[in-house]
């Protein structure tokens, strides 16, 4: 046993490679062992350090893979399960347990997260050399009983199926202990690099090999000052020093100092010594100069995106300045990989920098996993429509074109069908011939045939089920679709898809192994397959060595690359505090460690945090050979963040924080990194909205435009203007002539007017282009409204001989029997329930009509408008016509005054602010239209809410009080003529704010005509701005911005072009209510009309 340590600015790999070469010269076969996270990288580093650049006698590997290189004899032939197979085994065993048998985990026994935690605990106990029976020492009786039962069941199953238990390393330990290794230990040597602690399993291997006479060399980084210090607690090197002291004590071998004498202390050595001095409370006087600050830079950026752009520019600039540099000389370290992953790809592709993020990718979100999930959902939930649509959207099932899939989806959404029997029936319903039923039935059979065959499978042996699954994949064209998908992709993506397919096949192989000879139902098979795929991960290797490697900062080793950029070093990310998320608490781990024999040790993450994080920081500071950049954003994941305390310490030592910003207001030579990034910079420059007028900038932009123009001309493209915000074009004259011929009447409805003032472009989409909502055969808000309207229309038309309640019930019965409504509301139990709710609403609303003796209804569903009477006249002489339908017209019995009623499904009131801004013209339009038809005497226009009143019982003292409060909400809401209000009863909300004099009434009608005139002039001129209104000046309501995917309008970027609603100018800032508020708005209307 030989122990070595060296200062952190001397390459430990070089020293250990020399040791390995000496061992080879002595006739040894050397295994160069590196940690799992560094083995791939360490192999390249060792090859670079070898004097011959190669050696057949040195194998760079990991502890777990050593068994592959040793000859093991007479071991029983057992199949080894990986995490996927182990997960399936846990799933199978837990499925067989009764939930009542598990006191803690019974309700979640097949939850994927629980299974994942059980797998992790299984591995942890294996690595720590702990037996599952050791769990008897747990103090929590319920948890102890559950875990022992689960592991006992799984262990018995693995033994029964001749499936190997434990890890590869545990099998090697078993082989060495039982003398099953025929390799000559005297010819083997181990060189161990990069460790600061061994797991119990790794330490056991080292111990056994040492006992067999294997020469072992172990190296670590440590300063002589730290190693010889009697007190190491809190020291930066605490992790490595304790590791060396433990080994030195165990094997009675002092560690040798291999540190080299450096002619000059470099910037990173200086920073390391200052940090070490800070943590061991010793005094050290070192000056940090400008060269040090240049070599070790600390950046403060605004956002993560800005960080990545600055890094990309810096790399591009260095490559431009030094032709000897290549991408492999750069390394990027991330504070949080998940937060940077998406932006990293976007920005580095933009700057055309090849990179490799050495991280396994989960299959959970791959279309193949979604494909299996959709089939499982179809089986489990009995063929829901949504699950079938999700299956088709994966683009992996059947070889149907996208247009066929869209047509099929549109039709089944129209039908609203669910359940396999419904899909098996021939499609016969169509909406006025809109659907091609013949084609849709062909698609239906193509989609259903493979699924029907698969779903007919009963519980059977796993082997037979896999054969049926294979046939299904073939008949469903899944393999063909995957093949077609990959042929159109780039080489890197093709490799990625190939790895995904391998992972998918591996899950099936593990299933076949675990369930060999077992009876499995189709649903269980699909659930297991989905569970296995959700746990699966895949990874690709870089296509070329010359790439920028990207990794998490806590996996870095000293002296890794010439230039290192560590970004995202916020207080939350550096240091990383490991959290215990396993099934065993830290306290339980401590108790188990104390109760078991020496050498059996579960890791307690919280006890390792401090020494691990300090050593990581030391490695980070020394990761670069030439230049190191440490960066922290002020905003991390859209939340304010602070830079790490470690960075603040470096600043305290004399290193300088540099405020780094992307400057899009000016362009410089730094923007010439790559063609794509140059275009991006130009776009950002234009989007600033303010062009610099300096001669230098203007010249640069002109030259840049010419260069880009030539490049685009070579590609046969135009050089378009770069838009700064979504905009629309005015319609051409010939288009307007075709849409609105001069001799043809121009009609504008009240709903069209409201849509125009909500967003002019929405009016264009709906009323000019005719954009329609998806058709639905099932009842919706429109059909519910028609149903209630028809009931009241019929009830009020019936003779008055019978009581109102009798007439209402007769109207309900007759309307329910109408063919249209009978087809809708008898189709399903859900529709029948909806009908019952609507009938309750009808009976409740009838309360107002039943007890209102002051009025009589003279018309129902009355049409108004038409060619006979123009609504308004435009300045150019063209007439605008308005037509529509009034739900009901009432007449006062006292004097014959007319009132208009409009039914609403929710509480609706007339609001002067909305009316002024064109958003509430319905009632004034009805009154104006009737006035043009000869009516002169009005008592008002109002809304009637058709809904059951809801009253909170907490807000009232008694049930009688609840009835009183509920009746208050059941009133007509709207506008009333002051002179007629005395004739109206309690069912009318006729407060002062809702009452108008004759002059005020006419003022409203005049302003309403003005709103129609303004809208009509813009529509006939073909001008439709993208200007959704904003009520609060900060956001756009969802119902206003319904066509965002078409317009591209985003409130956070384009709020400036939204229409801000007009408001009252209140000089004293007092809030007006009631009559004063009405008068203020009427005055504003007068001012607007007098302009």
Swiss-Prot record:
One GO MF term, please?
ATP binding
One GO BP annotation of this record = double-strand break repair via homologous recombination
- Report whether Nuclease shows up as a keyword of the record: yes
Q: Give UniProt keywords alphabetically.
A: ATP-binding, DNA damage, DNA repair, DNA-binding, Exonuclease, Helicase, Hydrolase, Nuclease, Nucleotide-binding
The EC number on file is: 3.1.-.-
The record, for Gene3D superfamilies, names: P-loop containing nucleotide triphosphate hydrolases (3.40.50.300)
Please name the InterPro entries in this protein's record. ADDB_N, DNA_helicase_suRexB, P-loop_NTPase, PDDEXK_AddAB-type, Restrct_endonuc-II-like
Q: What class of enzyme is it?
A: hydrolase
This protein's cofactor list reads:
Mg(2+)
One short Pfam name that applies is: ADDB_N
Family of the protein in this entry: Belongs to the helicase family. AddB/RexB type 2 subfamily.
Q: Give the NCBIfam families listed for this entry.
A: rexB_recomb (TIGR02774)
Relate the assembly described in the record. Answer: Heterodimer of AddA and RexB.
**Additional comment:** Despite having helicase-like domains, this subunit does not have helicase activity.
Per its database record, what is this protein's job? The heterodimer acts as both an ATP-dependent DNA helicase and an ATP-dependent, dual-direction single-stranded exonuclease. Recognizes the chi site generating a DNA molecule suitable for the initiation of homologous recombination. This subunit has 5' -> 3' nuclease activity but not helicase activity.
**Protein name listed in UniProt:** ATP-dependent helicase/deoxyribonuclease subunit B
Species whose genome carries this gene: Streptococcus pneumoniae (strain CGSP14)
